[in-house]
Design a protein with these regions (language model features):
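Class I S-adenosyl-L-methionine-dependent methyltransferase catalytic core
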Residues: 1-165
Length: 165
């Protein structure tokens, strides 16, 4: 199995901030009867190699340490999807019936996932693409559900590179 080599020194900080948010989010909902959903549209293999060579759990695996009722992980690369499935089955076997790992482009699949959501659910959607890969209509549709907290991280250099000069 191989780990993804994306990110930089900020990756560990970003993941720490995100897990602190998940802590607070689930505390806020602990006495609510909502079904809690987690969606990671760029789930990867589950592991990320930092610049110092150390491997850390990525957002998908970190989310499994939290008590959501359902998890949706999308990954376009079949090898990364298979690695994520392997790790989930071996480290989080008690949650496999709650986890949906989908091998597809998020732009093709997120719409159908969003249509399944109801007012009796609350969720977190984590969007951390490698470039500007997300169709804006998907982001718009996700925001219109009114039930998702959306984390959309994008590389500013990819955005500025596409601006008119």
């Amino acid at each position: 199995m191989t780990s993804q080599k994306f990110g930089g020194d900020w990756t560990a900080k970003k993941l720490n901030i995100f897990t602190s948010y998940l802590d607070a989010y689930l505390i806020a909902l602990q006495n609510q009867k909502f079904k809690k959903i987690y969606i990671d549209a760029f789930a990867g293999s589950g592991k990320t190699v930092l610049p110092d060579g150390s491997a850390v759990d990525g957002s998908a695996l970190l989310s499994l340490q939290y008590n959501f009722d359902e998890y949706y992980f999308l990954e376009i690369d079949p090898n990364r999807k298979n690695e994520l499935e392997y790790i989930v089955q071996n480290r989080f076997s008690e949650k496999t019936n709650k986890v949906h790992i989908i091998n597809d482009n998020c732009n093709n699949r997120l719409g159908s996932i969003l249509k399944k959501l109801t007012v009796y659910q609350r969720g977190v959607m984590f969007l951390d693409p490698y470039a500007l890969e997300l169709d804006w209509s998907i982001l718009s549709d996700a925001s219109k559900t009114g039930i998702l907290d959306i984390w959309y991280l994008f590389p500013v250099n990819a955005l500025t590179r596409n601006l008119p000069k």
